[in-house]
Every structure is written in structure tokens, then in C-alpha cells.
């Protein structure tokens, strides 16, 4: 028996660009004071996605939006089950008190990473508001958390994975589902 992987395109490069443009417009519409906005990427692709969104926001508004990184690894309640990976340095460029935080992750699955990221953020202070952006919501919630901004909802089975690929890192762009 072989481990053959099937890859399905969920968002092509063109569709991904349109989705990023839509998400950027939604952020501009929902966040009343963009100068108080802090984009916070969650490793690994959430960091890269935050950079893309920062560029998109700048091209639409002319504002340089601040961005940071939060690594929630040490705040996870499921480390024994999922294991640990190489830790990425947390970098929050400004005090978060009274800031509008936009947590950014590429694919959301059980929501445990998001809960851990929120716990990690609160160790830095109390923001005015925390919002969540995910490129893909797979379902399978274990916690009652919803994204404020979502690129696409893709119900999956547990033997499937979804990957965001970006040109500057992967030499291809899109969102892909892989079945094992």
C-alpha cells in the first residue's frame, strides 16, 4: 500500500489575490482607526500573510500599518499531543494597550493555536480589541472562536491538510488541499 498524496487547488493565484484584496477592504471598513491597528502574525505562514496584508493596506490607504509576531507555542494546552517545533521569536513593536490587534493565521483547524495566541498576547498587556483573520477556516472547532475576517471556509476531513503558498517563499501562490 502506498502513501499517495492528492493535491487539489482551493484558491488559484488569481483567486488568492482577489481574496486578499477583499479581506483588505473588509479590514479598512471594519477598523475605524487604522493608526491603532497592529497586525500580529502567528508562525509560520501567518507571519508571511501579515506582511502581504501590510503591503495591501499600504497600497489602498497610504498608511504604514505596524506588524508583529506572536509565537504561542509555550501557551498551548496540547503540547504533549502535537509536540513542539522550532520557536519563533515574539516581536511586538509597540505597547499593545488600547491597540486594535488583528491576529493573523493562514489555516485554522481546532482553534487551539488561536486560544494560545490570545493568552500570549495578554501577557504583553490588554489591547482594546482582538480580531482574527484566517485565510482558510477548516472547521473542526474545539473552542467557540470565530474569525472576524475569513478568506474561505473549507470543511475538511481529519486526513486532509490545507496549505497557503506565497510566491516570495514557495515560488508558487495559492491555497491547496492535500489528501493522504
Can you name each region flagged by the protein language model?
Residues 1-180:
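PRPP-associated nucleotide enzymes
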Amino acid at each position: 500500500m502506498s502513501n499517495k498524496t492528492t493535491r487539489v487547488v482551493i484558491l488559484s493565484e488569481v483567486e488568492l489575490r482577489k481574496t486578499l484584496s477583499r479581506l483588505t477592504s473588509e479590514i479598512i471598513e471594519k477598523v475605524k482607526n487604522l493608526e491603532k491597528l497592529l497586525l500580529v502574525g502567528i508562525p509560520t505562514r501567518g507571519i508571511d500573510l501579515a506582511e502581504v496584508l501590510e503591503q495591501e493596506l499600504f497600497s489602498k490607504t497610504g498608511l504604514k500599518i505596524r506588524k508583529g509576531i506572536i509565537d504561542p507555542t509555550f501557551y498551548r494546552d496540547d503540547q504533549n499531543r502535537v509536540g513542539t517545533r522550532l520557536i519563533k521569536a515574539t516581536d511586538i513593536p509597540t505597547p499593545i494597550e488600547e491597540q486594535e490587534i488583528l491576529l493573523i493565521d493562514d489555516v485554522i483547524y481546532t482553534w487551539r493555536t488561536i486560544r494560545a495566541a490570545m493568552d500570549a498576547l495578554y501577557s504583553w498587556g490588554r489591547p482594546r480589541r482582538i480580531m482574527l483573520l484566517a485565510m482558510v477556516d477548516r472547521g473542526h472547532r474545539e473552542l467557540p472562536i470565530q474569525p472576524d475576517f475569513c478568506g474561505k471556509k473549507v470543511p475538511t476531513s481529519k486526513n486532509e491538510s490545507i496549505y497557503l503558498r506565497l510566491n516570495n517563499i514557495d515560488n508558487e501562490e495559492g491555497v491547496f488541499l492535500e489528501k493522504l
